[in-house]
């Protein structure tokens, strides 16, 4: 059940289970519902509760923590990860055969290689080239080790600038607070900014329009390692992100709702 109302989704799943549905999944965006219902959701007849914003926040946080990763997906209760990497000139993976890859990183599986417009299902005879996008799968622990070995020249993200203080920002801050980064959020609505400031005392909250280039310059956008645009308007997110790239911010993440 994925209606805009959490209560309707939960009730629909309860009813569906009583009518014989074997599996029921409810989209629940309110974190309070997720916390209170999790302990007894199965007895109510809800097999799984999903929170799109929370999952997005976790993905964004992982991308920030591991700058070389272009995308990351988790499976098996977050114990298995599929990551996408672009092979750079100075990467130890450049010009490596998959036979050599298997010898060196035996616990990691190369699932796919994307080379320009071509998608390659790899065999041992394939060679990884500069510019390839490779998709590798492994346990969470082995992926972390693999990342450290292959991204040793990558500078860790120490500071993050976020524009927009919506629900996704709250979830993202919940995750990032454990990463020991300097975080600044620019939010144009006073009430939301004050609530963020009260909820996250270690995060610097600025009242202003984060899509205004003058404000971004004033807040020192060029000094940040990562920039995340989470306003409610796709066009504003894209324009702000392009400006961040012009300012040589290392990692830029943009929220786009429209496909």
Which residues does each PLM region occupy?
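Cytosolic regulatory regions of ion transport systems
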Residues: 1-259
């Amino acid at each position: 059940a994925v209606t805009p109302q959490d209560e309707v989704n939960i009730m629909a799943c309860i009813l569906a289970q009583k009518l014989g549905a074997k599996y029921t999944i409810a989209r629940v965006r309110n974190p309070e519902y997720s916390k209170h219902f999790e302990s007894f959701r199965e007895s109510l007849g809800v097999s799984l509760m999903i929170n799109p914003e929370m999952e997005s926040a976790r993905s964004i946080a992982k991308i920030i923590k591991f700058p070389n990763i272009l995308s990351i997906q988790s499976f098996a209760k977050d114990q298995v990860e599929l990551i996408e990497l672009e092979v750079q000139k100075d990467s130890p993976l450049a010009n490596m055969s998959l036979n050599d890859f298997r010898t060196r990183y035996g616990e990691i599986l190369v699932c796919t290689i994307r080379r320009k417009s071509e998608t390659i299902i790899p065999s041992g005879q394939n060679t990884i080239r500069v510019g390839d996008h490779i998709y590798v799968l492994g346990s969470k622990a082995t992926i972390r080790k693999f990342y450290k070995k292959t991204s040793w020249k990558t500078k860790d993200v120490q500071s993050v600038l976020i524009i927009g203080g919506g629900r996704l920002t709250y979830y993202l801050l919940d995750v990032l607070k454990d990463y020991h980064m300097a975080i600044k959020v620019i939010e144009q609505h006073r009430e939301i900014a004050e609530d963020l400031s009260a909820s996250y005392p270690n995060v610097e909250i600025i009242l202003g329009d984060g899509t205004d280039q003058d404000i971004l310059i004033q807040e020192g956008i060029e000094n940040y390692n990562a920039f995340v645009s989470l306003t409610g308007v796709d066009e504003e997110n894209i324009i702000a992100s392009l400006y961040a790239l012009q300012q040589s911010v290392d990692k830029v993440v943009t929220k786009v709702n429209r496909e």
